Amino acid sequence: MNSQQCVIIAIAGASASGKSLIAKTIFDELRRDLGTDQIGVINEDAYYRDQSHLSMDERVLTNYDHPKALDHQLLCTHLQLLKSGEAVDIPCYSYTEHTRMAETVKMTPKKVIILEGILLLTDPKLRELMDASVFMDTPLDICFLRRLTRDVAERGRTMESVISQYKKTVRPMFLQFIEPSKQYADIIVPRGGKNRIATDILKTRIQHLLAK
């Protein structure tokens, strides 16, 4: 494998379905073999569009579960640059300010890039760049309870705002966009991010692709 090639694995599914956990598990276990600088994780959330030109009242009304809320074109460009051996500056997104921050995070080319995000499989151009894709098929009620706990504890949200957002956009957009994108996944993973067999299958697939 030359320095200008990389394997891109996408992990999609509902918010709080276990994407981050399985991505972290694969990252932690593969970096021992590949080296920390040879594997990286990119969160689709980093590519939410800049909303600094909007007031806070306008920002909170954005439908963050719709594909248009994300700059997939920039993500595609960054992945193409990484595959060609060039470093990129990944945006940083603030969940409390509902917009991008001024700083970015530099990512250098990697042998393995793990993408994780709710809407990754909805974009045909993104799918073309993936070497393998996964859909976390976790029941929506479990995802909601996890999301409620996480957003209140970690993202400065109120319980009322999380419930309201779930009713207005999260659940409807899951049914309209996210769940239908499951048809494009190579692997469908039940039981969340602690599914050890699914994790091992993914690791084996990555190792096979690296050996080509």
UniProtKB/Swiss-Prot annotation:
CDD domains: UMPK. Pathway: Pyrimidine metabolism; CTP biosynthesis via salvage pathway; CTP from cytidine: step 1/3; Pyrimidine metabolism; UMP biosynthesis via salvage pathway; UMP from uridine: step 1/1. Gene3D superfamilies: P-loop containing nucleotide triphosphate hydrolases (3.40.50.300). The lineage of its organism: Bacteria, Pseudomonadati, Pseudomonadota, Gammaproteobacteria, Alteromonadales. Its EC number is 2.7.1.48. Belongs to the uridine kinase family. It catalyses: uridine + ATP = UMP + ADP + H(+); cytidine + ATP = CMP + ADP + H(+). One of its GO terms (molecular function) is cytidine kinase activity. GO terms for cellular component: cytoplasm. It is found in: Cytoplasm. Keywords: ATP-binding, Cytoplasm, Kinase, Nucleotide-binding, Transferase. InterPro entries: P-loop_NTPase, PRK/URK, Uridine_kinase, Uridine_kinase-like. GO terms for biological process: CTP salvage; UMP salvage. It comes from the Bacteria. Its main location: cytoplasm. NCBIfam families: PRK05480.1, udk. ATP binds at G13, A14, S15, A16, S17, G18, K19, S20. This is Uridine kinase.
